[in-house]
Amino acid sequence: MNTKEISKVVDLVRESNPLVHNITNVVVTNFTANGLLALGASPVMAYAKEEVAEMTSIAGALVLNMGTLRPDEVEAMLLAGKSANMNDVPVLFDPVGAGATSYRTEVARHIPAEIELAIIRGNAAEIANVINEKWEIKGVDAGAGNGNVVSIAKQAADELNTVAVITGKEDVVTDGERTIVIRNGHSILTKVTGTGCLLTSVIGAFVAVEKDYAKAAVAALTFYGVAAELAAAKTVEKGPGSFQIEFLNQLANTTSSDIEKYGKIEVI
């Protein structure tokens, strides 16, 4: 797997304009929709239990994000996830804040037990808590802690039979056999709320057009990181507000050639 190979997935997304169904949180809905549109995908946010199964059946991917967790949303996620499994629609799960509260952790473990996942994406603490490994977490945005990130990712991939994506200063993608580290991105991403949640949805757009889910995830992470670097180069001295706007621009303007030129991936 190399940058030339993965760069082609970006073009596929823009050619295909995949529909990505997001059951996500109230904090990030607008940013997620705008980010997907900028990339070249089509976002939809449908939460009502009366329609989620039908909406999911026509989508290219389903993204489940438990950032602002409510019982009715959990019910909708389960209905949508089961519809996705029945209709061969890949499911991506973002267990935001797993480990922060007992309820949140319970839901984060229940969803993978009920739904077959294509991708699970979170920080190290969240993924560790989903698979019941000890890792301290403070709030839904915290990922710092002690432990071997690659080991946790491989364990999650094996136990959940999925592709595990752990994001942080360096990003790790593994299907349990292949493991890839991506070293793109910029620290200013942590100053804008919703960048992690949008990332999961962007991976969803890539998964919708590339059935090798590990390859799709690596392509999405590299694209996202390069776009962040290009945006930061123009705006980091101005601050996160300017960066957020320019980042949307770069999601639209970053090309497959940029990924080949600036992508930093390593198969380990």
Swiss-Prot record:
GO MF annotation: an example: magnesium ion binding
Broadest EC class assigned to this enzyme: transferase
ATP-binding among keywords: yes
Family annotation (InterPro entries): Hyethyz_kinase, Ribokinase-like
Protein origin, superkingdom: Bacteria
Residue positions binding substrate: 45, 194
Residues that, per the record, bind ATP: 121, 167
SUPFAM superfamilies per record: Ribokinase-like
Cofactor(s), names only, from the UniProt record: Mg(2+)
GO biological process, one term: thiamine biosynthetic process
Catalytically driven reaction(s): 5-(2-hydroxyethyl)-4-methylthiazole + ATP = 4-methyl-5-(2-phosphooxyethyl)-thiazole + ADP + H(+)
EC numbers on record: 2.7.1.50
Keywords: ATP-binding, Kinase, Magnesium, Metal-binding, Nucleotide-binding, Thiamine biosynthesis, Transferase
Protein's pathway: Cofactor biosynthesis; thiamine diphosphate biosynthesis; 4-methyl-5-(2-phosphoethyl)-thiazole from 5-(2-hydroxyethyl)-4-methylthiazole: step 1/1
Family note: Belongs to the Thz kinase family.
Function: Catalyzes the phosphorylation of the hydroxyl group of 4-methyl-5-beta-hydroxyethylthiazole (THZ).
Protein's recorded name: Hydroxyethylthiazole kinase
Species name: Bacillus cereus (strain ZK / E33L)
Gene name of this polypeptide: thiM
